[in-house]
């Protein structure tokens, strides 16, 4: 494509390839570079908040609500609002962030927003104010993840993306259990040990999580270098003025690239289902009356299961291809949704659900991130990942809204969960119709 008002790409494709962190022939393909490790570490930091959001925060929010409050619908609408804000902001900011030096600035701003709001949740708030602060923290998290995902193309090569992305999710799952276990021990043992109330211990867990998040973000902040970019700092103003025209050009380029467009549509639907299952599993279990302790421990098991399974998924992608493994995960998620809707009634079934989700959750997320990175232009990575995020977050709006609305209208949370299967079925059709552009080539996509 031809970008309107686009500054000259810096560096050139040849220079970018020379600067990209390639692996030397002497280095084992099984070893990771320091930059790859420091990129992975951020997943360890932010995943602590993700896990707390899945297991503890919905339960705490439910305790703040009136007795007749419906946490499933309230939580669904909260997730919808957070996703909508990110979906609107990311394509615009993503285009600007492709300017040299801007990506790390936007990343830092959203990261700090997430951390500060995570600490703010520790304040004595009513249920509505608490959910508003949580929405702001979620916006900070998801905004930082958009720029973090796009950093993958600056961190490793096409051939290693599946592996590095999978390791990011894997170590995020296992690493996040450390502060989570500390927080759970504090919540359940703090009242007897320190004489604090359970509420005070829960609030303290928010601060612990924020500190962990900060500690594991510092390595990335101090080491990241933007290899692929479209303008030097002196050309930033011109690039920003052309942002809206560039967004239109990028969208037209995505539409023109049929394999990429087909994948984006499939991604829109299946990541919607995945994110909805993740964000609403605990609130669904709570609504069914499952004990909070059982919910928390079961979700902790998910993290431990997801660690090896994410790494295994990355290895299988090297053998069978990323798209094949993504398709397999979509089929698996359809089975998971049917299980949750028809069979999940007690703690035992929730444990089974947690294990099943752990087997496929990290794999489908990691391979989606790396597969997309292989088929887009590297010098426009943040702009393209902005659209990746708008597809993902807009999808999340639909998924959580669908579950929340269906549950509210029918009064049956199981029917709301079952609606997720429709999204997965549509995604499966588009995946099966898509021609895999990575087959027989390891070259990155280029801008027409």
Predicted segments, located by residue:
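A membrane-interface helix-boundary motif in multi-pass transporters
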Residues: 187-211, 405-424
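Multi-pass alpha-helical transporter architecture, strongest
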Residues: 212-223, 418-448
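Juxtamembrane intracellular "pre-TM" segments in multi-pass secondary transporters
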Residues: 23-36, 224-264
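Structural signature of the two symmetry-related core transmembrane helices
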Residues: 105-120, 324-339
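Hydrophobic core of transmembrane alpha-helices in multi-pass small-molecule transporters
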Residues: 117, 128-144, 349-363
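Helix-to-loop junctions at the C-terminal end of transmembrane segments
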Residues: 88-102, 308-322, 407
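Intracellular juxtamembrane helix-capping segments at the cytosolic ends
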Residues: 143-157, 363-377
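Helix-loop boundary and gating motifs at the non-cytosolic
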Residues: 27-83, 259-298
